Structures are given as structure tokens and as C-alpha cells.
């Protein structure tokens, strides 16, 4: 029977049962761009989908804290003007906002104190930031700060890992973003995300991604989950998102080798041009810094490291292909 058993379900020896008591850090990066969520609501016919995501996220965070009394959580928001810690509350926003008390109606007064502290802080900071962002929804140029929020999350993870070095704190990162029907992979800056991949690999921190709406494929985010042993899930609707959070996204890093996770059909491993930002399959590579280019840069210099390219090599690259004379004669006869 062992010969025909699915290798995914074969028994794996665990190093120690004591790892069950090791605390875990869950860091969540939430993209709260009002323009993206408004476009998603218009296409899907949903109302206040970002609120649905927030409610499901609160349940997910509470369940993570319930697994172990020493577990930690952090939530970072990515918006058009930068990033902000929603929990733990940053020092410059430590004051309570009494005017937002109506926004806390979804929290029970009889809730466990630790849950209540996290939920109240998260909701207060979220509504203050989201209302401020709504006033900038008509701004013509809005850049994605998702890569910056991921970098901040990994920085926070590294700091806590150093503080809890004696108990080997486990960590994982969850990214929740909303897609657009007109989105392009250029909005996700390739080099910062690659830096996040290298940092997460060194920290042994899996990066999971939930993408809601938009194109099913996301080149750089899929590369991120594949390289860090994470999970990538694309959802057409926010309905039932709590089911995905409580199943696929709740797998502890220590159990990912023995639990069958959702798999991606295919991952696009293409890179992006340093100059144009476009995704390219074939391009030029600087031999010094490995910078990828889709065009020959002006001045024959690398835009990343300023290395001077060999003029003879550039001349060969710019040289047009030579068509044999015999082929030209045949073409003329046919004409």
C-alpha cells in the first residue's frame, strides 16, 4: 500500500513536539486604496467590500491570538500616500478618537480583553485612514505602496525576531490587495519586491497573498509566494473570504511541509525592465549588476550601476540582421 500512496500524504517525522508551544507572529499588509475598492464594488455589484474584508480579518486575527497566548499580530496599511501601522498603534496616533465610537459597533462589550484591544485599535485607525484617503480619491496619479508596506512588515518581523530570539519566534506575512481591471504589473515595483523576497527567505518567513478581483495572474506577487513557500489565492468576490483565511492562510510555517496547500497552476517567472518597468521575456542584462533592460540605454551606460558598456558589443547588438543575397533574388523573382 505504501508504494501506491500519494507522496503528499506520506508520514513525515517531526523534529520535536515541543515546537507546538513556540509563539508565532502574524503580520498583515492590507491595501486600502479607495479607488481600487470603489472600482471593484462597481464591477462586482458588492457594497462596502472593504468592510467585509475588515470584519473577516478581525476574526482571523482573533483566531491566531487564540491559538497561543504568546502569539503576536501586526497590521500595516498601504495607501496612496505611504504606509501606516494600524496595529500596534504608532506613537504619533496614540490618542483615542472619541468621534469614531460609532465605528466600534461590531465589537462586543463582553469580548476577551486582548481581542478587544486589537480590534478597537485596528478599527479606529482603519476608519481614520480610510476617510482621509477618500478625500484624495480624485487625485490623478496614485502609486502603489504595497512593496513599501511589505518591506516595513519584514523589518518589524526582524525586530521582533531579535527580541524573542531565545524562544525562536516563528513568523509569516499575509498580503491582501485589491486588483483593477486596468491594472498592469508595472505598479508592483519589481526590485523592491525582489528585495522583500530575499529578506523573507533569510528570515524563513512565508509570504501569503490574497488578491481580490482584477486579473487572476500577478507576475511578481506569484513569484513572491512561490519563492517563500507561501500561498497565492485569487478571489472574484469577498463573499466567503473568511473561509480562505481560516483554512489556507492559517497554516503555520512549521506545518507547511506536511500539509497539502493550494497550488498554483503556473507561475510567470518573467522580470521587468529597469527603465520602462514593462514585463519582458527576452532582454539585455548588465554583466556587473545583473540589471535587466528591454532597450539599449542611452549613452551606453547601465542606469543602475553606471557601468560603461563595450562599444563593440553595443554595435553588434544594434546591427541589423544580414539577409543573404540568394534569398533577395528569390523574393524579387516571385514579385
Curated annotation (Swiss-Prot):
Record GO biological process: nucleotide-excision repair; regulation of DNA-templated transcription
Any one GO molecular function term: zinc ion binding
Principal subcellular localization: nucleus
Recorded GO CC terms: transcription factor TFIIH core complex; transcription factor TFIIH holo complex
InterPro entries xref list: TFIIH_Tfb4/GTF2H3, vWFA_dom_sf
Origin superkingdom: Eukaryota
Chain positions of all zinc fingers (C4-type): 286-305
Keywords: DNA damage, DNA repair, Metal-binding, Nucleus, Transcription, Transcription regulation, Zinc, Zinc-finger
Key word Metal-binding present: yes
Pfam families named in the record: Tfb4
Location(s) in or outside the cell: Nucleus
Function: Component of the general transcription and DNA repair factor IIH (TFIIH) core complex, which is involved in general and transcription-coupled nucleotide excision repair (NER) of damaged DNA and, when complexed to TFIIK, in RNA transcription by RNA polymerase II. In NER, TFIIH acts by opening DNA around the lesion to allow the excision of the damaged oligonucleotide and its replacement by a new DNA fragment. In transcription, TFIIH has an essential role in transcription initiation.
Entries under PANTHER family matching the protein: GENERAL TRANSCRIPTION FACTOR IIH SUBUNIT 3, TRANSCRIPTION INITIATION FACTOR IIH TFIIH , POLYPEPTIDE 3-RELATED
Recorded family membership: Belongs to the TFB4 family.
Oligomeric form and interacting partners: Component of the 7-subunit TFIIH core complex composed of XPB/SSL2, XPD/RAD3, SSL1, TFB1, TFB2, TFB4 and TFB5, which is active in NER. The core complex associates with the 3-subunit CTD-kinase module TFIIK composed of CCL1, KIN28 and TFB3 to form the 10-subunit holoenzyme (holo-TFIIH) active in transcription.
Protein name, UniProt field: General transcription and DNA repair factor IIH subunit TFB4
